[in-house]
Amino acid sequence: MAAVKTPVIVVPVIDRPPSETFPNVHEHINDQKFDDVKDNEVMPEKRNVVVVKDDPDHYKDYAFIQWTGGNIRNDDKYTHFFSGFCNTMCTEETKRNIARHLALWDSNFFTELENKKVEYVVIVENDNVIEDITFLRPVLKAMHDKKIDILQMREIITGNKVKTELVMDKNHTIFTYTGGYDVSLSAYIIRVTTALNIVDEIIKSGGLSSGFYFEIARIENEMKINRQILDNAAKYVEHDPRLVAEHRFENMKPNFWSRIGTAAAKRYPGVMYAFTTPLISFFGLFDINVIGLIVILFIMFMLIFNVKSKLLWFLTGTFVTAFI
């Protein structure tokens, strides 16, 4: 009997074809196999069902989608996802990335999935790489059996954890641990009804403030949501910080420092990703990242100690125009 496909949704955070998130499976899927879904659209009918018994590679289990809705640059209708404070002080990148996910959860697409009794959706931002998706089938079954609402597939905090067996078979040994404030939307599997309930609660509460991850954790506690984090997640979903770091430098005003930063991102991706991470918005006028904060602190140091070096002030000025 034909079964409803599980959607695998690629969320664009950089300029990159969706098939590059799955680099080793071009014989199965390519860019033409991805259906673009925008705001107010639903899944194309032709990809709703499939016979899965004869597919050892598992790719026929899924409907591959690229989500193109939730773009706050093109529309201000997503401001209700954020409080007035966050609309002023949260960085554009933070709001843009969160809005893409919340708009997806709040979309006609998810409502249709609920009506069609689709239980789970796999969501992956396109700065990740998944080389082998065969782990998804046993994971989805285990999530159903163990009543897991969200499986986060990117680890934020490392250290000792109390791990629980999720899948144990001849091909996969997978463990998880319970999530806390270490929330990430980079890659995850979510129950459709859970996504709808979370976004409904966010809207009813007046939108997210600057403490997004604390608020999501609070909502999870209040709604008794079971969020697990995939142990050793990088084995299954590889996040490439170089892609985002390069994207940030490419979107800066072209100058000497942006070219230096782009080159440095290739050699030191983790460091440059951290340095270019936006921290706060200055009343919506511009965002301040880690490098910008260091520059501001350095300017305060020079003012306090009355530094008169013209060279230092010149170099500081070039940093200000580049990173703030």
From Swiss-Prot:
Keywords: Host-virus interaction, Late protein, Membrane, Signal-anchor, Transmembrane, Transmembrane helix, Viral attachment to host cell, Viral envelope protein, Virion, Virus entry into host cell. Residues 1-284 are virion surface. It comes from the Viruses. GO terms for cellular component: membrane; viral envelope; virion membrane. Induction: Expressed in the late phase of the viral replicative cycle. It is found in: Virion membrane. Disulfide bonds: none annotated. Immunodominant protein. Envelope protein that binds to heparan sulfate on the cell surface and might provide virion attachment to target cell. Belongs to the orthopoxvirus OPG108 family. This is Envelope protein H3. It comes from Vaccinia virus (strain Copenhagen).
